[in-house]
Amino acid sequence: MFIEVLKSKIHRATVTEANLNYVGSITIDEELMKAAGIYENEKVQVVNINNGERFETYVIKGEKGSGTICLNGAAARLVQVGDKIIIMAYCLLTMEEYYNHKPRIVFVDDENKIVRLSDKEEHSECIC
């Protein structure tokens, strides 16, 4: 049996661009991708904190250190520049793997610079 769990998360990233006339996807700063363990072309779920939208897309690698978080194609209609979003990737684990699994959580500031890395979240933890 397999269980789908959170693999990694970039928490409260700021949308820097929304490009409607692109094929599709989300462009993420390569530095953030590496810190979170998110790979190019990997499927991710995006949650918009500002408006509650939730959607899936795939990742394109952005310029390292740029802070770029750009929603492309149809997803560009679901965000505004400046919105705060959560980007999550999931993985399938066996029950044996599950008990040793720790997600990679990347907390960023308003410029999408890494401020903290973690492998857990506490209930009611507020990162504002």
UniProtKB/Swiss-Prot annotation:
The active site is at residues 25, 58. It comes from the Bacteria. Gene3D superfamilies: 2.40.40.20. Its main location: cytoplasm. GO terms for molecular function: aspartate 1-decarboxylase activity. Transmembrane segments: none annotated. Its cofactor is pyruvate. GO terms for biological process: alanine biosynthetic process; pantothenate biosynthetic process. Heterooctamer of four alpha and four beta subunits. Belongs to the PanD family. This is Aspartate 1-decarboxylase. It comes from Caldicellulosiruptor bescii (strain ATCC BAA-1888 / DSM 6725 / KCTC 15123 / Z-1320). The lineage of its organism: Bacteria, Bacillati, Bacillota, Bacillota incertae sedis, Caldicellulosiruptorales.
